Curated annotation (Swiss-Prot):
GO terms for molecular function: structural molecule activity. The surface protein (SU) attaches the virus to the host cell by binding to its receptor. This interaction triggers the refolding of the transmembrane protein (TM) and is thought to activate its fusogenic potential by unmasking its fusion peptide. Fusion occurs at the host cell plasma membrane. Keywords: Cleavage on pair of basic residues, Coiled coil, Disulfide bond, Glycoprotein, Host cell membrane, Host membrane, Host-virus interaction, Membrane, Transmembrane, Transmembrane helix, Viral attachment to host cell, Viral envelope protein, Virion, Virus entry into host cell. Residues 619-781 are cytoplasmic. Glycans are attached at N189, N212, N241, N266, N285, N301, N309, N382, N464, N530, N535, N559. The gene is env. This is Envelope glycoprotein. The keyword Phosphoprotein does not apply. Residues 634-666 are annotated as: Disordered. GO terms for biological process: symbiont entry into host cell; virion attachment to host cell.
Length: 781
């Protein structure tokens, strides 16, 4: 193959040199003009690529790469465009080799228009902005920053599953929280963490639900001392959660320490709630008789009511801090065995521990302040409040949806197949049928047993009554179990109703009730979303903040709809034209649209050529009016000697400006040239197919439409070139009747006289020495 390629190169060079010699010989002999020889050489594919073509190719490639950079992603469509541009640019480059400088007058205009369109499109691309998105189901809170939120757990179950909290040590829990925080820092674009789905409407029933269905709260074991620091008002309460265990008849249960930032955990239903209460005053800021407890949701004022059972443990006394001393509560009092040197100080202020039912607790877990001026009057918590805290589990409402800023390039998450509706009504109906069937069966069994006992001896009546009592007990136990299951079903249905309300709100805002985000067209500052307030607001304030943002979005949508209706009423009747224009604009980069543009371009070219033809015809008609035929009297010799010029015959008037004879010959020559060019191109195609030159053949296939257009332009220019010169006042004709019929080159063309016949006779009779040096000046049109 290499040898064949080397052989082909000299052959091609020889063909080029032979073609050049033949054209030069034809020009020397006068068979071809210089213009025709140049056209023949150009049509033989020996041209070069024009710089405008190279600039256009580079502009298109830079536009594609620039669009890629603005979007920030490389999709399949962009790859297809890059791959398709290579053969297109190749074909344009190959077609440019056959275009001379005269044909670039209209091609340059097309390129300039295309470049302006590309510049306008690139200039219209806006920078990336942010818009507001609503977090959709599953309900939860997104961690927008690395703030230490005091509670969260990761779960995928419909009911929160916090099992991993019960089997880990405190250090492991904190390590897990840190790992999640680090993961959140790595991710971006609204990373979503699912938190416990705390029910909004179920307050007491689900929290107190237990295996024995008695509703009696489980006693809390001793908690010891927790190291607590921070302030609940800013959400910075931190500390070590202590895992505690107790065994009883109901199985093993695990609880976290009761303190600000701690948790209650009931392993029966695996339900996590937050204990948010704690004193927020410090020793320096306390005033006598006033103290405030805050739960990070709502402040609670605590006074000094009369109580029967209370005690305290100071956080700080006489400038000494006892927080990190490891004190324990033994027998209702503080164990001072580990700190004997401070025994006196603690006894001076009272070393009692809070009596919480039958379980002792160190009150330091609740952050009790101490007033230094009056040692006998201490700040304590209302006993009724303690009973309420022990009886009812306190639930923290978790926002089921929120608003976050996301970039404009973020695409909505396309969810999978939606989950089917649960047949809750069918389950309830089946339960009712089961209850009725079981009731009927139990009643029938009791009746049969009673009839059988009556038919038997009277002595077995007591045994039958015993059997009936057992059946009634079993029936009662069955209804207790059914009650428990119906309660569970009630909680699930209540939660689904709440989710339905949330989805209704989301649907009203134009959101799909599934997926990850619901994208809006407004920026965060337009709806009033400020994520910097996260660390300085409580949960209740944050929920009201969400309500305000939701109201702002409703107002924006309402204003937008009103503006749309107003604009629609103002532009009534113009919508179809606007939509049609937008549709045409959106389809401006499709192949079909460019074909339409080429058709219009062909129409414009045909109109231009028709205009030129009419202009040439008018010019020829104007030139024809300047001719005057000589009659018999004017043909005679002015001197009366009867001699006539030898080279002037009665039928040979210089009427070469008339287009009838010249145009037919031009048309035949143009037809011959076109056939010659097409025959040459077909021979080249056959050679490429025979030698399997697929690269050259592919370029020629791509440049075929443009080559045909260029061929048409060349034929028209060849036909109309004499007419263009007629517009300047000259008429192109033949050298004479006695000479050959070939057309001379443009440098040696014979110029016909456009004056009167009398002037022509006078000029003919002049001798060569009488002709002025500057020659005969033609008459300007």
């Amino acid at each position: 193959m290499m040898e064949e390629g080397r052989k082909e190169e000299p052959e091609e060079r020889g063909e080029k040199s032979t073609m050049r010699d033949l054209l030069q010989r034809a020009v020397d002999k006068g068979h071809l003009t210089a213009r025709e020889a140049l056209d023949r050489w150009t049509l033989e594919d020996h041209g070069e690529i024009h710089p405008w073509i190279i600039l256009f190719c580079f502009a298109g490639a830079i536009g594609v790469i620039g669009g890629w950079g603005l979007r920030g992603e490389l999709n399949v469509c962009m790859l297809i465009v890059l791959v398709v541009l290579v053969p297109i640019y190749w074909g344009i480059g190959e077609a440019a080799r056959n275009i001379d400088s005269l044909d670039w007058k209209w091609i340059r205009k097309v390129f300039i228009v295309i470049i302006f369109v590309l510049v306008g499109l690139l200039g219209g691309c806006s920078a990336q902005r942010q818009h507001v998105a609503m977090l959709l189901s599953p309900p939860g809170i997104r961690l927008p920053s690395t703030v230490d939120i005091p509670w969260f757990c990761i779960s995928n179950a419909p009911i929160p599953d916090c099992v991993h909290w019960t089997v880990q040590k405190p250090d492991q829990k904190h390590q897990q929280i840190e790992n999640v925080m680090e993961l959140q820092e790595v991710l971006d674009n609204a990373t979503f963490f699912e938190v416990p789905d705390l029910f909004d409407r179920v307050y007491l029933e689900l929290a107190r639900l237990d295996a024995n269905s008695t509703g009696v709260p489980v006693n809390i074991p001793p908690t010891g001392i927790s190291q607590v620091k921070g302030d609940c008002s800013t959400g910075d309460i931190q500390g070590m959660n202590e895992t505690l265990s107790t065994r009883g008849t109901l199985g093993e249960r695990t609880f976290l320490s009761i303190r600000p930032g701690g948790w209650f955990t009931n392993t029966t239903v695996w339900f996590c709630v937050h204990w948010p209460f704690g004193f927020i005053q410090r020793k320096e800021n306390l005033s006598e008789g006033s103290a405030q407890v805050r739960n990070c949701l709502d402040p609670i004022n605590v006074t000094e009511p009369r109580v029967a059972n209370y005690s305290y443990c100071p956080l700080e006394y006489k400038g000494k801090n006892y927080i990190n001393k490891g004190l324990k509560c033994v027998g209702g009092r503080v164990d001072l065995s580990s700190n004997p040197e401070q025994h006196t100080d603690l006894l001076a202020c009272g070393t009692f521990c809070q009596n919480f039912r039958n379980c002792d607790m160190v009150s330091r877990d609740i952050l009790i302040g101490y007033h230094p001026s009056q040692q006998k009057q201490h700040i304590y918590i209302n006993h009724t409040f303690w009973e309420q805290a022990n009886t009812q589990w306190i639930l923290v409402q978790v926002p089921n949806y929120g608003f976050v800023p996301v970039p404009d390039t973020e695409r909505p998450w396309k969810g999978g197949k939606p989950r089917g509706k649960r047949a809750v009504g069918m389950v309830i109906f089946l339960l009712v049928l089961a209850i009725m069937a079981m009731t009927a069966s139990v009643t029938a069994a009791a009746t049969l047993v009673k009839q059988h006992a009556t038919a038997q001896v009277v002595g077995r009546l007591s045994t039958n009554l015993t059997y009936i009592t057992k059946i009634q007990n079993q029936y009662l136990h069955l209804f207790q179990n059914l009650n428990t299951r119906v309660n569970n079903l009630h909680h699930r249905v209540t939660y689904l109703e709440f989710l339905a309300e949330v989805h209704e709100v989301q649907t009203g805002l134009g959101c799909v009730p599934r997926g990850r985000y619901c994208h809006f067209d407004w920026r965060p500052e337009e709806v009033g979303l400020n994520m910097t307030l996260w660390n300085s607001t409580t949960w209740q304030q944050w929920m009201s903040y969400y309500d305000q943002i939701e109201e702002n979005i409703w107002n924006l949508k309402y204003n937008w709809s009103e503006a749309l209706e107003k604009g629609k009423s103002n532009t009534d009747g113009l919508e179809p034209d606007v939509f049609r224009y937008l549709a045409d604009l959106s389809s401006s980069f499709t192949w079909g649209s460019w074909v339409d543009k080429l058709v219009w371009l062909a129409y414009i070219l045909l109109a231009y050529f028709a205009f030129k033809v009419l202009q040439c015809i008018m010019s020829n008609l104007g030139a024809q009016t300047r001719y005057q035929l000589l009659n018999a009297q004017e043909d005679t010799d002015p001197a009366g000697d009867g001699d006539q010029p030898d080279d002037h015959r009665s039928g040979d008037t210089p009427r070469s400006g008339v287009p009838s004879g010249g145009w037919s010959q031009k048309l035949s020559e143009g037809k011959k040239i076109g056939c010659l060019i097409l025959r040459t191109e077909w021979q080249n195609w056959r050679n490429d197919l025979r030698t399997l030159r697929w690269l050259t053949l592919g370029g020629k296939i791509l440049q075929l439409p443009l080559s045909l257009l260029v061929l048409l332009v060349r034929i028209l220019l060849h036909i109309l070139s004499p007419t263009f010169q007629n517009q300047r006042g000259w008429t192109v004709g033949r050298k004479g009747t006695g000479g050959d019929d070939r057309e001379l080159s443009p440098e040696l063309e014979y110029l016909s006289w456009t004056g009167s016949s009398q002037e022509m006779v006078e000029m003919r009779d002049l001798k060569e020495e009488d002709i002025p040096e500057e020659g005969i000046r033609p008459v300007e049109m």
